């Protein structure tokens, strides 16, 4: 194909994403679009087709972005090439959304006709506006009994400030309005603006590791053309590779002769090691490189840290390899080696939130057959010491001794909670209980309120989301962003088993809640840790001071069973002898701590948490 034909084809390319809050129908809409454009035969069609991970199907959520090429014959008779990128809706995966939006010119904004705009809808719209995308509003689920499309239309105009007069009314499930959406994409989403004759410039927006082909790069070509046989160069580290195959996903990979401006597809180039590529890097040709790299992505900083340890310590290196391969596919994951006296060798991992942590742990266990122990998550604290230095601590076990601490600062987040009027009281009560500070409250319309609080991240990390959902019957939605550090009265609480500290069970707590939290955890551990042959005291301590204690009673054999009658001193002698044995055992005995005990520090029951 010569340059002229390529330029004509470029005019017919449309790249767009589907963005929405969780459960507003993104993946179902993507399914209908695939059916409508005959990309997938009805025999191969299945619900949530683009959610290829088992985990995504089970949980009914999208975790990974997915890019796919479709051909659509518009009403004007022309054939257009669409690149559709399905994105996640959960706040933990905002990074995936920002990456997919950088590869598009337009975004289809799906809003539930009954629920209206939610917190994540807004967050994703702002990301789309940052990328200068054309936004096409779609009001979905109009066949629901509670649907009120006109209210949602005014909400879109008032809250987001975009014209919704031409918003498509659709029902992805029933297949209503799908053609109107595709026609709007043709009409309103601009064609890619790159230059076909310029040196190659392509953005890596995702990558996966294939054990046969090495690293497979998912790219969006911004300028130029790339073909098999070309020598490509990574602009961040200058490494070069020979392209072996280029192609697109439709939804299965299909090899092509070239990828040109505006195409969204994949490249394989025998890239063997995971470290050679980075999501957000720019690919160019080695013999005709681009003058400057694309802006790429801002690096995501983890919000939550936890320790991951293999139950079988000999699989430490397998865990390292698994994390490296997962990092290719999940750029927001960070990790570094660490050791624990209780758990041996493992990794300290950083995540964007609890759901992200959960998903990574499950993927490691499923895709790499690892058995893992996870320690309770914690956030990053800044500890100002008496000698004038400041230490950054992400692991409670590394918290300095209380006598050396001048003050401790913890991260706060600005939480936007969208909630129906009836539940405002419940949300405010929960936020106050979690040490939140009220900032402001806006009425979006007669039914919905946007409540803004500043809350310590450590409180959000534990169980805020679950509690928010249960106290508002699932109607509230949450979005949060960092709001800096503040000084708080925090202390480190150690858990002692049989008078020995278990470093993996330590956690940071606000001084006002230390006593209740310590007491609750000690009681919980007492139930979870199996009884031993000797009595085991479980203690919670701040520094040298014990604040709570509970004893796990010993299992004991009835040594008097064979002692029929006889003198009482004989019975006493047997009991004393047993007592001596237990004492000796206690000095050398070690206590096995089950995985549930580590998670107990995390998930305290409601009555434990009445704080």
UniProtKB/Swiss-Prot annotation:
It catalyses: GTP + H2O = GDP + phosphate + H(+). One of its GO terms (biological process) is positive regulation of translation. GTP binds at residues 23-28, 140-143. GO terms for cellular component: plasma membrane. Residues 11-193 form the tr-type G domain. It is found in: Cell membrane. GO terms for molecular function: GTP binding; GTPase activity; ribosome binding; translation elongation factor activity. Keywords: Cell membrane, GTP-binding, Hydrolase, Membrane, Nucleotide-binding, Protein biosynthesis. InterPro entries: EF-4, EFG_III/V, EFG_V-like, EFTu-like_2, G_TR_CS, LepA_C_sf, LepA_CTD, LepA_IV. Transmembrane segments: none annotated. Its main location: membrane. Its EC number is 3.6.5.n1. It is an enzyme of class 3 (hydrolase). It is a peripheral membrane protein. Gene3D superfamilies: 3.30.70.240, Elongation factor 4, C-terminal domain, Elongation Factor G (Translational Gtpase), domain 3, P-loop containing nucleotide triphosphate hydrolases, Translation factors. Required for accurate and efficient protein synthesis under certain stress conditions. May act as a fidelity factor of the translation reaction, by catalyzing a one-codon backward translocation of tRNAs on improperly translocated ribosomes. Back-translocation proceeds from a post-translocation (POST) complex to a pre-translocation (PRE) complex, thus giving elongation factor G a second chance to translocate the tRNAs correctly. Binds to ribosomes in a GTP-dependent manner. Belongs to the TRAFAC class translation factor GTPase superfamily. Classic translation factor GTPase family. LepA subfamily. This is Elongation factor 4. The gene is lepA.
């Amino acid at each position: 194909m010569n340059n002229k034909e390529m330029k004509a084809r470029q005019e017919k390319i449309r790249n767009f994403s589907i963005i929405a809050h969780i459960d507003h129908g993104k993946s179902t809409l993507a399914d209908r679009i695939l059916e409508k454009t005959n990309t997938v035969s009805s025999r191969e069609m299945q619900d949530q087709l683009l959610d290829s991970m088992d985990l995504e199907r089970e949980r009914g959520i999208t975790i990974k972005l997915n890019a796919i090429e479709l051909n659509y014959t518009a009403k004007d008779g022309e054939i257009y090439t669409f690149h559709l990128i399905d994105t996640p809706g959960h706040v933990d995966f905002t990074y995936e959304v920002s990456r997919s939006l950088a590869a598009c010119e337009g975004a289809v904004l799906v809003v539930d006709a009954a629920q209206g705009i939610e917190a994540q809808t807004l967050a994703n719209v702002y990301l789309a506006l940052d990328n200068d995308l054309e936004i096409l509003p779609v009001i979905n689920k109009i066949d629901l009994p509670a649907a009120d499309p006109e209210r949602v239309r005014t909400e879109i105009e008032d809250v987001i400030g975009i014209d919704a007069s031409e918003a498509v009314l659709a029902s992805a499930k029933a297949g209503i309005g799908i053609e109107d959406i595709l026609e709007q994409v043709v009409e309103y989403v601009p064609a890619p603006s790159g230059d076909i004759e310029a040196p190659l410039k392509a953005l890596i927006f995702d990558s996966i590791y294939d054990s046969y082909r090495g690293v497979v790069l998912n790219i969006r070509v911004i300028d130029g053309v790339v073909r098999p046989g070309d020598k490509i160069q990574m602009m961040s580290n200058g490494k070069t590779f020979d392209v072996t195959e280029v192609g697109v996903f439709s939804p299965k990979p299909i090899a092509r002769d070239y990828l040109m401006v505006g195409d969204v597809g994949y490249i394989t180039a025998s890239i063997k090691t995971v470290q050679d590529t980075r999501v957000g890097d720019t690919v160019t040709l080695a013999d005709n490189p681009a003058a400057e790299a694309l802006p790429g992505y801002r690096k995501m900083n983890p919000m939550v840290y936890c320790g991951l340890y293999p139950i079988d310590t000999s699989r430490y290196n397998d865990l390292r390899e698994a994390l490296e391969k997962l990092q290719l596919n999940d750029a927001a994951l960070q990790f570094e080696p660490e050791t624990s006296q209780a758990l041996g060798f493992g990794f300290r991992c950083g995540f964007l939130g609890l759901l992200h942590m959960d998903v990574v742990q499950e993927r490691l266990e499923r895709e790499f057959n690892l058995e893992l122990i996870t320690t309770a998550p914690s956030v990053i604290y800044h500890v100002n010491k008496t000698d004038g230095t400041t230490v950054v601590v992400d692991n409670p076990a590394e918290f300095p001794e209380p006598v050396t601490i001048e003050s401790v600062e913890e991260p706060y987040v600005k939480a936007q909670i969208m909630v129906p009027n009836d539940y405002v009281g419940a949300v405010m009560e929960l936020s106050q209980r979690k040490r939140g500070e009220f900032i402001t409250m806006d009425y979006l319309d007669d039914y919905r309120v946007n409540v803004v609080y500043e809350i310590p991240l450590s409180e959000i990390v534990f169980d805020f989301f679950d509690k928010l959902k249960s106290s508002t019957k699932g109607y509230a939605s949450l979005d949060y962003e960092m709001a800096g550090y503040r000084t708080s009265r925090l202390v480190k609480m150690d858990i002692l088993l049989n008078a020995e500290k278990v470093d993996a069970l330590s956690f940071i707590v606000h001084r006002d809640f230390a006593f209740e939290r310590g007491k609750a955890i000690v009681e919980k551990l007492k139930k979870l840790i199996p009884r031993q042959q000797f009595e085991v005291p479980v203690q919670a301590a701040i520094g040298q001071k014990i604040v709570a204690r509970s004893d796990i009673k010993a299992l004991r054999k009835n040594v008097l069973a064979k002692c029929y009658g006889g003198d009482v001193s004989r019975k006493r002698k047997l009991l004393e002898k047993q007592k001596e044995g237990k004492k000796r055992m206690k000095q050398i005995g070690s206590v096995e701590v089950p995985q549930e005990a580590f998670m107990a520090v995390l998930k305290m029951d409601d009555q434990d948490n009445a704080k």
